[in-house]
């Protein structure tokens, strides 16, 4: 079974974990209703995507 020969230093451990952080989601604004929405997704408020109505929001709720 593999066992490390040397103890991993705090510096090396932190350098390895430098890319493990979480990133926040980018939020864009819907051009139709100006409400916040996630990019490349249908607007949950008005139901449009790229200027076309995809969902009938009044019928869905």
Curated annotation (Swiss-Prot):
SUPFAM superfamilies given in the database record: Zn-binding ribosomal proteins (SSF57829)
Region (Disordered), start-end ranges: 1-20
Keyword Iron: no
Alphabetized Pfam families for the sequence: Ribosomal_L32p
A cellular component annotation (GO) from this entry: large ribosomal subunit
GO molecular function, one term: structural constituent of ribosome
The entry's keywords: Ribonucleoprotein, Ribosomal protein
Any one of the GO BP annotations: translation
Transmembrane segments: none
Biased composition (Basic residues): 1-16
Keyword set includes Membrane: no
UniProt cross-references to PANTHER family, sorted A to Z: 50S RIBOSOMAL PROTEIN L32, LARGE RIBOSOMAL SUBUNIT PROTEIN BL32
HAMAP family in the record: Ribosomal_bL32 (MF_00340)
Family as reported in the entry's similarity comment: Belongs to the bacterial ribosomal protein bL32 family.
Record's protein name: Large ribosomal subunit protein bL32
Gene: rpmF
């Amino acid at each position: 079974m593999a066992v490390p020969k040397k103890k991993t230093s705090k510096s090396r451990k932190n350098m390895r974990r430098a890319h493990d952080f979480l990133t926040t989601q980018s939020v864009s604004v819907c051009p139709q209703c100006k409400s916040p929405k996630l990019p490349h997704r249908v607007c949950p408020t008005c139901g449009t995507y790229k200027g076309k109505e995809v969902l009938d929001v009044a019928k869905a709720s």
